[in-house]
Amino acid sequence: MQITFLGTSTSQGVPVIGCECDSCLSHDPKDNRLRSSVLISEKGYNILIDVGPDFRQQMLINKVKKLDAILLTHEHNDHIIGMDDIRPFNF
């Protein structure tokens, strides 16, 4: 089983627009984080946990070619707003 953390930030992402804290001003790649999502891969199956606004970017960065299931943890926008971008997986 492979677990990939696609995003680990808050609902605003990091860096946060207009924020001048050390993390948001940092040039270290670890301080540039997408919104929360996890991909679980096992025996050719891909299960995605949450589909936030960074979904498209997360799929492209990680070269995900298919999704078999999606688990939505709750209905806040930072966990579901990327649903429209799932369409290419159905073609």
What residue spans do the PLM features occupy?
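Conserved beta-strand hairpin/beta-sheet module of binuclear metal-dependent hydrolase folds
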Residues: 1-62
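Active-site metal-binding motif and surrounding structural segment of the metallo-beta-lactamase
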Residues: 46-47, 51-91
